[in-house]
Regions:
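Catalytic activation segment of kinase domains across protein kinase-like and atypical kinase folds
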Residues: 94-97, 159-164, 168-181
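Phosphate/ATP-binding catalytic cores across multiple sugar-kinase/actin-like superfamilies
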Residues: 146-160
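Membrane-interfacial amphipathic/re-entrant helices at transmembrane-helix boundaries
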Residues: 137-144
């Protein structure tokens, strides 16, 4: 899912998702879950000069930290698999490329709304997000519930002494799940 937003104090209209794709939704026990692959290669949202891939080590880090956070009771995306692509990737030095497949209640980020605002799709996105995550809420209640979910998540981080290294609008989900390690 594409998104834009504020990063390092400035607005960036094209932040991502230039290396990931939403594979679809699955239902389990009456809930929808997003299946998402990261490090898949170029997408229509890739930035100029990007190859859309990720290192195997960064995908393994995402897997390990997300599973540790889950075990510690922190709302988070979950990693289903890490796949070595068998291809080399240049990131400082040549190393193996990888893909992480993850699952979450949502991959809709605050930055997804920043992008929607540029294209007049904010109401459609909000209506979808409310129906999916906060049924029956009006827009004000939706905003309040998203804030509450994010506050609960950050309080879990504080309890553990965890600091998200790049905490901005692209790494903040409306479901309150920790994303992108």
């Amino acid at each position: 899912m594409a998104y834009s937003g504020f990063q390092f104090g400035a607005f960036n209209p094209q932040m991502g998702d230039g290396r990931a794709m939403l594979l679809g939704e699955v239902e389990k026990d009456g809930r929808l879950w997003d299946l998402h692959a990261k490090g898949t290669g170029l997408t229509p949202f890739s930035r100029l000069g990007s190859d859309g891939r990720g290192t195997l080590s960064s995908m393994l880090r995402e897997y390990l930290i997300s599973e540790a956070m889950h075990a510690l009771g922190v709302p988070t995306t979950r990693a289903l698999a890490v796949i070595s692509t068998g291809r080399p990737i240049q990131r400082g030095h040549v190393q193996p490329a990888g893909i992480v497949v993850r699952v979450a209640a949502s991959h809709i980020r605050v930055g997804t709304f920043h992008l929607a605002a540029q294209t007049d799709y904010t109401r459609q996105l909000a209506d979808y997000a409310i129906a999916r995550h906060y049924p029956g809420a009006d827009y004000q209640e939706f905003f309040t519930q998203v804030m509450d979910a994010q506050i609960r998540t950050v309080s879990h981080w504080m309890r553990l002494g965890f600091i998200h290294g790049v905490m901005n609008t692209d790494n903040t989900t409306i479901s309150g799940e920790t994303i992108d390690y």
